[in-house]
Amino acid sequence: MTRRACDLCPLEAFCKPATLNVQRTSKHRPAEEMRSDKESQSIRVTIVQASPQPSDLASGLRKALALIEEAAEHGAQLICFAETFLPGYPAWLDFCPGAALWNHAPVKEVFAGLRANSVVVPGNETQALGEAAARLRVGIVMGISERVRDAPGHGTLFNSLLYFAEDGRLVNHHRKLIPTYSERMVWGQGDAAGLRIAKVHNVNFGGAICWEHWMPLTRQHLHNAGEQIHIAAWPTVHEMHQIASRHYAFEGRCFVLAAGQIMKASDLPIALTPLEALDPQTLIERGGSAVIAPDGRYLAGPVFDEEIILYATLDLQEIERESMTMDVSGHYSRPDIFRLQVTASDRGDDISGK
């Protein structure tokens, strides 16, 4: 058998995808009674890699709630979803060149559909997610396209992450700081009000959305906050996104849950024509979800091209061991030379746990 160069590398374990802790939605190991506490210093985490329902928020929410229930039944304590899973990432921005045409009636209709199916915070969807979190005693991180209803900016959508604690409280609400490239046609700029950590089962967790992982000061701010678990929300976790997620884990000495979703060409709006002819079954968002350790190695995944639930039990003491060599907010930093100032004004959200 021919061996690849990486098979001979002493860092082989770091480069290769993990083969453990990957479970399909139809098959699960017996549930494990895992609850994080000071004695066990562990937490059971889950990434739900699934197909959204781009034109039907209600159906997408029902699917998400069913998957949350399933994951909780199998021991999950923290459950996360991909970028804008509700109602689904607007992949037509990447595949349909007509999306950028000025005053183009079809694209305005598609945008109106995205707006109608975006989540109001607080609203019926956040109530349902909070109730599920409280009933199942799990933390939930959900990527949404957010619509402002009764406040300034009511004509603007945001790319957001919602964080629910195990008691059902919405403990953080982050809006993506800068929509990336074509995303600026549908989403507005966010703020730093949600750029902070929250707690689930007494563990510090935070997150960032897509290309925020290439904003060095954003990373430093979250590292300074003391993340133990970081949710990296992507539409799909392709090679460069894998690199960014693993770099974040290594740099921040934290666990990273890199979450992607599955979308087919058939999910593109009929009103817009793709740049090239695509078979309806062609995958345009391929998943790639993975759980990454504080030293950058894979604990679960990455898994591509299928709907799946990934599980991993995280040993939080691993953070303590890895911090011996790197602490970018402590012994591997120079605050006497560099200073970071963050303007995080209060957005006015009624969010507990600040």
Question: What are these model-derived regions, one by one?
Answer:
Residues 6-9, 15:
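Cysteine-centered motifs
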Residues 261-354:
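C-terminal beta-strand edge segments of enzyme domains
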Residues 46, 162-164, 290, 310:
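Conserved hydrophobic/aromatic positions in well-ordered beta-strands
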